[in-house]
């Protein structure tokens, strides 16, 4: 819990902001124990899909959107991608097989990768690091 936030915060400057959306209060509590004193972090407790629907209605757009869970990656991806500024990044992880994946999930991952590589207005690159990353850059 919090590895993604640690990675992102390490590369951010003092004027940047990280919005962390977490559905489970216990998981957010663990992450907050580590990062709560960092003024760059905004904590949102709630459903990722609901947050995405609310966020696209606001004018703010982001330099980087890191889709680390089902909302924004396997559903409501169009909403998450809409939040990315021109020339910004949309980052997907966990694209290599993982222990505990439900049966048939590899087909979801394969479809996701193929879909991302065919979207107009985006350049994509698969990065064979860690759990398997895809970097998508908006034109």
Protein language model regions, located:
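S-adenosylmethionine/decaboxylated-SAM
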Residues: 1-139
């Amino acid at each position: 819990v919090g590895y993604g936030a640690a990675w992102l915060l390490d590369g951010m400057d003092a004027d940047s902001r990280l919005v962390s959306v977490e559905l489970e209060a216990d998981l957010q509590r663990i992450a907050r124990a580590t990062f709560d004193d960092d003024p760059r972090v905004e904590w949102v407790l709630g459903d990722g899909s609901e947050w995405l629907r609310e966020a696209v209605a606001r004018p703010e757009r982001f330099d980087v959107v890191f889709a680390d869970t089902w909302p924004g990656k396997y559903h409501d991806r169009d909403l998450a991608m809409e939040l990315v500024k021109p020339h910004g990044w949309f980052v997907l992880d966990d694209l290599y097989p993982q222990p505990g994946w439900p049966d048939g999930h590899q087909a979801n991952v394969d479809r996701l990768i193929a879909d991302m590589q065919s979207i107009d207005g985006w350049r994509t690159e698969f990065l064979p690091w860690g759990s398997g990353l895809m970097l998508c850059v908006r034109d």
